[in-house]
Amino acid sequence: MSRQIALLRGINVGGHNSFPKAAQLELAESLGLKDVSVLLQTGNIVFADPGTPPAETARVLHERIAADLGLTVPVVVRTAAELAAVVAANPFPQAAAEPKTLHVTFLSEVPADTSRLDALDPAAFAPDRYRLIGRELYLWCPGGIGRSKLAETVSRARLGVTATARNWNTVGKLLALAEA
């Protein structure tokens, strides 16, 4: 069975955008989504492919969350095959040994303007590194993302698209759920 994964940005982070796990499940099922699982409290919903393109699924979820909860929550959706490709394309395989140091920012589309990222001097942020591959921005911070100047700089780069990040542990768990 083909599956889709909805990634909601900014849910239950720092006490903002409260949207409990049970309510996420209920909302997804109320939209007619089937075989729904919610991973963690932070907006990771896995479900049977509803037969709509991922961008349409994202739009419907975004609009329903706004209508039902009054929250403006950006949503990015990937298919299970797309998520598997994200894992396979990891440009920092050495980071797999410490998955909390690797993050993937999922973008709604390929950014039209990457000049702010392109202008970054990698040496200025060593040992932290990033790589933009299609609609994913991989960020490896061996010393931890909380102390990373690169993470802060990249987050301010404003690529002009909807974006939400997950650490490698979460990416792996989402893929396992999507392939189950």
Q: Model segments located where?
A:
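Surface-exposed, charge/polar-rich loops and edge strands
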Residues: S2-T42, V46-A180
